Each structure stands twice: as C-alpha cells, then as structure tokens.
Amino acid sequence: MILALAMSTDAFAAAVGKGTALRNPRLSEALRTGIIFGVIEGLTPLVGWALGSIAADSVADWDHWIAFTLLLILGLLMIRAGLRAEEPEATPAIRHSFWLLAATGFATSIDAMAVGVSLAFIDNNILITAAAIGLATFLMVTLGVMVGRLIGNVAGKWAEILGGLALMGVGTVILYEHLTM
C-alpha cells in the first residue's frame, strides 16, 4: 500500500493543478479525472512488468525526460490559457478533454512503469500491486481535483497559471530525482 500511495503522489499534485484550472468542477468531473488517471497509473506497472529487463536500461535513460517534457508543455499551455483568460464571469467553464487528461496521466505514471520493470524481478503479485496503485491514484486524483477547486475559487483567474506552474513543478521534480540518482 505504501508503494501505491507513493506512486500516486505525482498524479495528486497534477490533479490539484487540473482542479485549479476548472471553474467549480463537479464531483463527476473529479471522478472522471480520477478514473482516467487511475486506469493509466494501474496499467503502466503491468506494461513495465511485461517489458521486464528487455527494455529496462533504455527506458531508464529517457523516461524522466519524457515525463518532464510532457508536463512542461501541458503546464505552459495552462499558463498561456490563464494569461489569456478574461474575468471568471465571462469565461466559459473548462472541461479537460480525455486526451489532455490521458497525456497528463501518462506523464505522471512513467515512474510506475519503471516500478513495474523492477517488480518483474521479485516475487510479487503484479495484478494486486497494479490494482492497488490504480485505486490509490483514483482516490488521490479525485481528492486532488476537489482540493484544486478550493484553491481555484480563492485564486480566481490566476488559478490556471498556478495549475500550470504546479504541472511544471511536478515535471521538474521528476527530472531532478532521476538526474541526481
């Protein structure tokens, strides 16, 4: 369970950023985001486990760069949208597309794929582990979107800028952690 919670922390931070960008997201939007992130986060260790040692060395060389680049681009897009935003009353409610959520979910789950690779070498039930990671991520992301909503209501039109900075921060932390290992 500790592994599952650890794997979901990046997704939680990204979800807070997403929640700040959504004007008054409903619980259904938070659940939708949680499901997308949870499914992706639960599947990536399975993919990593299946790849096993075949691609471990090559994936480890660039996984952090992919995550950093995706989160940087998504963060910059959110900041740009925030800078262009009009007053909250004049802007339509935002609903993040499936593909935008999936890209963010994938970027925050690359580390789970690497964990899956390492799990291929130990005696572990990968299905239970992957399900626990997916469930923990679902719960953390759903909570993160709602926390982001509170921050967004306080921050007003700056919420999307803050959300973009949060995504860029998550990407930077991922890059830093891998470069200093």
Curated annotation (Swiss-Prot):
GO molecular function: manganese ion transmembrane transporter activity
Domain of life: Bacteria
Cellular component, GO annotation: plasma membrane
Keywords attached to this entry: Cell inner membrane, Cell membrane, Ion transport, Manganese, Membrane, Transmembrane, Transmembrane helix, Transport
UniProt-listed Pfam families: Mntp
Residue spans crossing the bilayer: 35-55, 59-79, 102-122, 126-146, 161-181
Topological type in the membrane: Multi-pass membrane protein
Main location: membrane
Subcellular location(s) per record: Cell inner membrane
Its biological purpose: Probably functions as a manganese efflux pump.
Family, as annotated: Belongs to the MntP (TC 9.B.29) family.
Identification of the protein by name: Putative manganese efflux pump MntP
Lineage: Bacteria, Pseudomonadati, Pseudomonadota, Betaproteobacteria, Nitrosomonadales
